[in-house]
Amino acid sequence: MVVFATPLYYYGMSAQLKTVVDRFCAYNSSLNRRHLKSALLTVAWNSQDWTFEALEAHYKTLVRYINFEDMGMVLGYGCGTPSMTRAGKYPEMAYKLGRSL
């Protein structure tokens, strides 16, 4: 299982996670044959409904290209600080996603 966890930076994943994803190129055929499961966990300060559109599209394209099985996404809208995150529904959503796996 591969879990992509990242804050949202300029409507995409962090540079650190993007570096890891870019390194997949050398292992595409190996990853493709393994039929791994994947999930996306992300948070952002913004709470507009379009906040995660670009990251969702990138994740879904990556999952399709590498032949991962998407197990779900937790998109944490309005999680700009740890206290904002704790006060929201997203920690529980992440917990439930983890339990379902």
Predicted segments, located by residue:
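Glycine-rich phosphate/pyrophosphate-binding loop and the adjoining helix
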Residues: 60-101
